[in-house]
From Swiss-Prot:
InterPro entries: Ribosomal_eL40_arc (IPR023657), Ribosomal_eL40_dom (IPR001975), Ribosomal_eL40_sf (IPR038587), Ribosomal_zn-bd (IPR011332). GO terms for cellular component: ribonucleoprotein complex; ribosome. It comes from the Archaea. GO terms for biological process: translation. One of its GO terms (molecular function) is structural constituent of ribosome. Belongs to the eukaryotic ribosomal protein eL40 family. The keyword Ribosomal protein applies. Keywords: Ribonucleoprotein, Ribosomal protein. This is Large ribosomal subunit protein eL40. NCBIfam families: PRK04136.1.
Length: 53
């Protein structure tokens, strides 16, 4: 089922797939508003990389 046909479903998928932060030290996924990593407590976080096609 292609999701590209329905913009609402596409927005939901994009939010869940790309709106989070990655810890640069341990690689854990964190919520988008995180300041510290949930696993190693590092403050070295980056947003998830996203490429548009």
């Amino acid at each position: 089922m292609p999701i590209t046909l329905d913009p609402e479903k596409l927005a939901i998928v994009m939010k869940h797939r790309f709106q989070y932060k990655i810890c640069r030290e341990c690689g854990a996924r964190n919520p988008p508003d995180a300041v510290k990593c949930r696993r190693c407590r590092s403050k070295n976080l980056r947003p998830k990389k996203f490429k548009k096609k």
